[in-house]
């Protein structure tokens, strides 16, 4: 695929190029290349074809530009967010899978179905791309706890120990879903009565909740010890408040200490876990500090999938997620400016890009766009697709070397918004984002037309259809004067086809 030829263009005041972007209720992302020539910067862009569009990697000499957002290892020492498959997309929309035993299972899966999906992760290209985590969402557990009051699996559906051995034998890892509550029947378990650590609160599902300031609560780390014996590698801790959709469940309004308890138990277990806290958790203080000190990632929004639909996903449902990510990363920018390490990743929810439009409910262009956003945000890349019917585009989106190179880069430098014309980070329809620059001067730039705001985007609609926007080097972070101080000796343009 060759670049279209553009005459380098600039004037004495700024470096702009108008970029027409088309909406049609999806985000069109164009190729933007920054390149150096005789100590000057130019912009070059390429409009997407009907099927493919590109991102560029930008190169400078070995000096970090201002306003970069480098990350450190996550709290539990992971270099990047988790990649793999999660079951909730199928559980929420079982109509999408003709072979799914809906009459028998409802929204609960069994071990046979999990194996049929996760075995697909053992495809060499998928595994080489880092998709190695098989994540079981809600429904694997029993309503009856063991004699110690610990949550265990539903033996009529699963043998989690055997499943773990199978997955690990295939070179995969296993994740489990959890919630802060536990069946109230556990109240009388253990010699230190579990109920002595409960608060006086029962939700509509007859779950009770721990007082996480009670020292006996940490004796419940036996739960993590049990899960370690099963070989669990990742925990999704859902319904953590403040945040989450909890009003209809009668859950307590503040369960942030559950993340602290899980983190402490993980630390004492000696096993390397990834802990994802969910969903749409409160990002104001003191809770922002709690997530940063106890989790590897947090869900920035609620579920993006519909329920009981014939489609996995509707594209407009990501508007609120994109806006919540913008707020999330802006907080990280403030932390970085205050010399705080950036260890927490923003999780955008499952990634529905693996199946064709007739299954997914999104077009090929929209699938391209979703992949870019999830990669740029350094999100967990948990596929929500039916892994048994991946099409060619789905496989390429997931496993292409350029996709994985971009994902590895963005894991170190999550994208941050830089609005055209101002360089600000407010919510706008026509948005530019940058990941990096790295200490070697590499960066990715995304231009997005989010389309008309359907109510959750946080911005004012400027119009539908094709729009024009201009961006400058200064918009992306470094000023022209600071750029000219860098050694911008000519180098090859390395174009990475992201999708």
Curated annotation (Swiss-Prot):
Entry superkingdom: Eukaryota
GO-annotated cellular components: extracellular region
Keyword Transcription regulation: no
Record carries keyword Isomerase: no
Protein location: Secreted
GO biological process, one term: carbohydrate metabolic process
Glycan-bearing residues: 154, 191, 256
Keyword terms: Glycoprotein, Glycosidase, Hydrolase, Secreted, Signal
Primary location group: secreted
UniProt feature coiled coil, ranges: none
GO molecular function, one term: alpha-galactosidase activity
Family matches, as Pfam families: Melibiase_2 (PF16499)
Family membership noted in the UniProt record: Belongs to the glycosyl hydrolase 27 family.
Protein name from the UniProt record: Putative alpha-galactosidase 8
Naturally occurring in which organism (per UniProt): Emericella nidulans (strain FGSC A4 / ATCC 38163 / CBS 112.46 / NRRL 194 / M139)
Gene name as annotated: agl8
